[in-house]
Amino acid sequence: MIITEILGNRAQLSADEIAQYTEEKVKLPNLDLVKRIQRVTTDADREIGLRLPSEVKELKDGDILYQNDSLLITVEVLPTDVLVYRPRNTLEMGKVAHSLGNRHLQAQFFGEDSEYGETVMVLQYDHTVEDHLKHVDAQYSREDRVMPEAFRHAEHSH
C-alpha cells in the first residue's frame, strides 16, 4: 500500500466515529516526521509506503494515512527527549535564546495558555545545551514530550 496524501486528522473525529474502525498506528520518532518518502510499519505489522507531495511539510500526531469502511491508519508521534527552559524574566530569556541561537538550534515556544501553563522554550535534548543551561543557572527540566511540530535540522550559511 502506497500513501500519497493525508486524509485528515483523528482529532477531527468524535470518539464514537473512531470506535467504528479498527485503528492501526504508525509510530514515528521526531526525525521521521519530515520524511515525505519512507517505508513504515503499523502496530499490526502492516507495511506501507509513504510518498507524500512536497506540500506536506511534516506529519502530525493523529494524521490519517488511510481510511476505508472498517480500517483507520493514523500517525502516532513518539515522545521526544527535550529540555524545557522556564525563563525567570525577559532579560534572562534573551541572553539564553541568543546564546542558543548562535548554535543554530531549533526551538519551540509556548505561552501560559499552553499545556505547560507558563512561558517556556523547548529544545531537543543535547548534552551541551544542558551543560550551558546549568552553567547559567537556568530553570529547566528534561522531559519526554510529544511535540506539535517536528524539530528540523537548521540549515545556515555565513
From Swiss-Prot:
It comes from Corynebacterium urealyticum (strain ATCC 43042 / DSM 7109). GO terms for cellular component: cytoplasm. Belongs to the UreE family. Keywords: Chaperone, Cytoplasm, Nickel. This is Urease accessory protein UreE. Involved in urease metallocenter assembly. Binds nickel. Probably functions as a nickel donor during metallocenter assembly. CDD domains: UreE. SUPFAM superfamilies: Urease metallochaperone UreE, C-terminal domain (SSF69737), Urease metallochaperone UreE, N-terminal domain (SSF69287). It is found in: Cytoplasm. GO terms for biological process: protein folding; protein-containing complex assembly; urea metabolic process. GO terms for molecular function: nickel cation binding; unfolded protein binding. Its main location: cytoplasm. InterPro entries: UreE, UreE_C_dom, UreE_N, UreE_N_sf.
